[in-house]
Amino acid sequence: MIRIEILFDRQSTKNLKSGTLQALQNEIEQRLKPHYPEIWLRIDQGSAPSVSVTGARNDKDKERILSLLEEIWQDDSWLPAA
């Protein structure tokens, strides 16, 4: 099972629109589950920002997942309306 953990520092989350973290979780699940049906995803606040991907079959899979996460983050179409 692939485990993805995305943590935002508390200061960063203060500036996010309401519903942003849930929208991010929904978008990640929608885009990754067709390729990786068994994923465990955690998006939360932490003391420091971080992204962790574990449980990938190999480095190529891990890099692909990280690349997809970066694409999702850069594409703002999933962000909730103001």
From Swiss-Prot:
Question: What start and end residues bound the annotated signal peptide?
Answer: none
Keyword annotations for this protein, in alphabetical order, are: DNA damage, DNA repair, Plasmid
Q: Superkingdom of this entry's organism? A: Bacteria
Q: Which Pfam families match?
A: DinI
Q: Which GO terms describe its biological process?
A: DNA repair; SOS response
InterPro entries recorded: DinI-like_sf, DNA_damage-inducible_DinI-like
Query: Coiled-coil region(s) at which residues?
Result: none
| Keyword hit for Membrane | no
Function text: The imp operon is involved in UV protection and mutation, however the ImpC protein is not essential for these functions.
The family this protein is said to belong to: Belongs to the DinI family.
Stored PANTHER family = DNA DAMAGE-INDUCIBLE PROTEIN I, DNA DAMAGE-INDUCIBLE PROTEIN I-RELATED
Q: By what name is this protein known?
A: Protein ImpC
Q: Which organism is it from?
A: Salmonella typhimurium
Q: Which gene encodes it?
A: impC
